[in-house]
Amino acid sequence: KSKQTKSQVNNASSQLYTDQKESGEWEAHVLSSNYMYTLVNESRPFYVETEMLASTSFPLRQRREISLAAGFSWRGEGNEGRGRDFDRQRPPSTSIRPRSFREIPSLHTFGGFIEATYRTPNLHVEAGLRNQGLKSRDYALIYQTEPRLNLLWSLCSSPSGYTLSLKAGVGWISFMPTLEKLYPEAIYNDKVSFYYNDSNESGNTLGILTTHAPGMERNMKLKPTVNRKIEVGLIGKTPAIRLDMTVFFEKQTDGFSSSAQYIPFSYREYDYLSTAQLRPEYKDGQVWVNGKAVPYQEKYSYTPVSVPVNTLHRKKHGIEMVADLGTFSPLRTSLIVDGIWLYVREKNTALNGIWPIQYTDKTEYPYVGFYDRQGGPGNESRSEIISTNFRFITRIPRIGLVTTLTWQMIWLYKYRTLYNGSTGENVWPLYWCGTDGIIHPFTEAQKEDPAFAPLLSTTAPERFLPNSYKPYGMLNIRVNKAFGEHITLAFFANNLADLRPTRYSASTRSYLQQNTQPFFGLELQIKL
């Protein structure tokens, strides 16, 4: 059990608050302009897990061997804590609601695998199959099967220590949706329908809020994100150096993203009362003054809701390299160089609503457009990078000192935003909806209708220009000093030379500063 309490002064003008979690019109708490609040979070997590493993091996002739392994694991977890709570007269903000962890059902995750390994003096092959799943009270079983195959083949070797090996691999790895995606925070939209505050008489106030509570917007069709990767490489060794190079291709499907939806609702807006010493009251679902119902207008608005979706798709390919150039004896310094060339294409196919917040004669714009792009200028990006790290490691065992000097270089960096493979300066929505909530395809005729003109999404042409930065680098250092077998003191400094060059971004027409500011630190490690 744990509790966290915070106190803070709220310096805001008088506000209205309700803790109602259902849609409707409610009499609100009128908050004072300055108050202290206390926010309590009580968590009582629990979990139960079990795991079973089994393995065996079968020696064969000529130093060959086959080994088998299998396993299963299960974990159940939940939380019985009261969660987030506070004094309703002193809320941390006017948009927050209490939320108990008990509202979130227990989560059950499981995984099983089977693996076979074949070994010879020159060949090592691993083949496996893994299945992982997730189950909760409100969701059907979410699961994914992940095959993989790895190979290491010694092509040639010599007694003097020269070897060349081929490595290859193919496999899947999946990522289950998190608890926050399965059970997101419920959405509440509070509109002020009526507010009266008699400045001449303390306590003569009345506030009415209309709450629109679409609730917890869950996506019952949420799937795991799946990464598929293929790689092939060579490993070469000599008595002095080791070189490892890998070519890879990776494809991600059903990546997690969010889709912005807009749900319409209606609310009352009562006439404003400016006369002092009135006694408004709320009864029978209506505001009354001196026995007369206060007139109101019926208005419409939208509540934005973010729904988790599987719409992110990413492709990567590149070359990785690690070279251990050995130790230079006079200096007792070894040099390790690693680098990568990486090209990434990413596209998000989520359908997102955009509501132009325009007011005409104090009336909110009645239409929402739905576009095949996020809030930015496009829906896909392409990037390319070439980088290397040079690590100089100096060891002085006699005094227990290890110094690591790292020179990081970005030789090439390119980035570009696109809209469906091209530019998208002027984009009309694919769909639209009005205050009735019915979604319609957007037609050519509506492009000519002035009523729909605010739905045209415009973007400056330069936002789609490619960005390309000149090389830049950074120098880091780390010094470790051992005091006996149990104590190690480390000093580190990042961006030691304060290299912070600026590079011009064509898409934003601005200069961006690269690298972080220099920072230093000490670490103390004690082993008992």
Protein language model features and the residues they cover:
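C-terminal beta-signal and adjacent terminal beta-strands/loops
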Residues: 408-460, 469-472, 478-528
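Hydrophobic, lipid-facing positions within transmembrane beta-strands of outer-membrane proteins
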Residues: 46-52, 108-114, 129-133, 145-151, ...
